[in-house]
């Protein structure tokens, strides 16, 4: 017997606007068997009108994630094939436009597959299954991937803390095909990047910053550039390609720095114009300030500072401090390219934090360009939560 979920009166409004979440407080009653973790359930308004079909997650505040608003649509292999083909149509356009062999294929709710992200690196599909429903449908998803991409291997990188909120353990490994090699080389905008699928950050690389990396090129010609939290050198590669006189790449991970150097060499870029510094960014910026060392461009792309609302206040403090330090080591007329990937921090709050940092740094700052996540991380019109990456180009007087 199919389980039916009835909502509290008035809580159906968001679903009628096709928002894909139902929170625990929005559920009035459950009819039928008690749903198991990840089970597909039918969602009705308080009067019994069918609204959606979704996955039930008993341990999450997001109790139901909607698979479909079409009553005729069954959640099976064909369903996933249909979603994959729809997503691929957009990526085909982007891949041709930007010369991509690596991109986000599925951006979770924004591509109609809540709790599922899939990145493609050449012939490897790297999945993160972040919800109970995604875990329940894993076999159907992998079968659909094998149908749509028979040339590809499928690898799981569900080693993220958010799975704990769903009552799931972290998991990695081959789901079909071959084990990834040490590096898979992708290309974007004419730049080659070596990606560590098994051990790298996220699924191996920060694909969402592609458009920002390309935008950085116009600010760096002949400039001395500091690339903070450089990981495997993404922004630094674009800076060297854009004619920077020097790029100082900074990260706390020596393996990441080693890969950044490898990427620099692989692109035939002038390694003699690049430095690779293993250091804590906060400490290093203070050292630069104390000894009066200045840069023309500072790129500030830190990791997520806020994983939950309880961490937001501390995150705001961290973002303000690090942007203040960056401004203090910029030459007059310098450029700060600064970003936040914390979804809990909206664009307005981040802009205020940067403005507060300018006051503390005693520098006049003008916002001259805004940035967001790359186009293969689309924002669905019914799902504003899909917007998480924001950034600014700041002219620092």
Swiss-Prot record:
Entry GO MF terms: RNA binding; rRNA (cytosine) methyltransferase activity
Protein's cellular compartments: Cytoplasm
Reactions catalysed according to its record: cytidine(1962) in 23S rRNA + S-adenosyl-L-methionine = 5-methylcytidine(1962) in 23S rRNA + S-adenosyl-L-homocysteine + H(+)
Similarity comment text for this entry: Belongs to the methyltransferase superfamily. RlmI family.
Record key words, sorted: Cytoplasm, Methyltransferase, RNA-binding, rRNA processing, S-adenosyl-L-methionine, Transferase
Record's function text: Specifically methylates the cytosine at position 1962 (m5C1962) of 23S rRNA.
GO CC, one annotated term: cytoplasm
Enzyme's top EC category: transferase
Protein name in UniProt: Ribosomal RNA large subunit methyltransferase I
EC number: 2.1.1.191
Cited InterPro entries: PUA (IPR002478), PUA-like_sf (IPR015947), PUA_sf (IPR036974), RLMI (IPR023542), RlmI-like_PUA (IPR041532), SAM-dep_methyl-trfase (IPR019614), SAM-dependent_MTases_sf (IPR029063)
Species this protein is from: Photobacterium profundum (strain SS9)
């Amino acid at each position: 017997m199919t389980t039916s979920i009835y909502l509290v009166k008035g809580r159906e409004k968001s679903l009628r606007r096709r928002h894909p979440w139902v929170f625990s407080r929005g559920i009035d009653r459950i009819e039928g068997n008690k749903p198991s973790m990840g089970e597909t359930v039918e969602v009705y308004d308080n009067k019994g009108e069918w609204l959606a079909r979704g996955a039930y997650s008993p341990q999450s505040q997001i109790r139901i994630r909607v698979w479909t608003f079409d009553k005729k649509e069954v959640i099976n292999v064909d369903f996933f094939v249909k979603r994959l083909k729809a997503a691929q149509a957009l990526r085909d356009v982007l891949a041709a436009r930007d010369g991509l062999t690596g991109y986000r294929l599925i951006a979770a709710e924004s591509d109609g597959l809540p709790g599922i992200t899939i990145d493609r690196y050449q012939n490897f599909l790297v999945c993160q299954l972040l919800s109970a429903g995604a875990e329940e449908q894993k076999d159907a998803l992998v079968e659909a991937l094998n149908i749509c991409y028979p040339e590809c291997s499928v690898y799981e990188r569900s080693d993220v803390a958010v799975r704990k909120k769903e009552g799931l353990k972290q998991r990695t490994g081959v789901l079909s095909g071959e084990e990834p090699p040490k590096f898979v080389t992708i290309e974007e905008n004419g730049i080659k990047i070596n990606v560590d699928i098994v051990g790298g950050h996220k699924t191996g690389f920060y694909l969402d910053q592609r458009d920002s990396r390309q935008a950085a090129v116009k600010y760096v010609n002949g400039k001395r550039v500091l690339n903070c939290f450089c990981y495997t050198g993404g922004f630094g590669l674009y800076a060297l390609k854009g004619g920077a006189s020097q790029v100082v790449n900074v990260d706390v991970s020596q393996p990441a720095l080693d890969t950044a150097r490898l990427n620099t060499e692989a692109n035939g870029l002038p390694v003699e114009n690049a430095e690779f510094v293993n250091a804590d960014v906060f400490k290093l910026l203070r050292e630069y300030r104390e000894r009066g060392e200045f840069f023309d461009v500072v790129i500030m792309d830190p990791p997520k500072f806020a994983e939950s609302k309880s961490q937001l206040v501390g995150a705001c403090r961290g973002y303000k401090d690090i942007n203040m330090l960056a401004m203090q080591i910029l030459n007059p007329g310098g450029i700060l390219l600064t970003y936040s990937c914390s979804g809990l921090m909206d664009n307005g709050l981040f802009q205020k934090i940067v403005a507060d940092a300018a006051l503390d740094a005693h520098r006049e700052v003008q916002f001259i360009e805004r940035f967001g996540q790359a186009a293969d991380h689309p924002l669905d019109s019914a799902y504003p939560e899909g917007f998480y990456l924001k950034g600014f180009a700041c002219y620092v007087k």
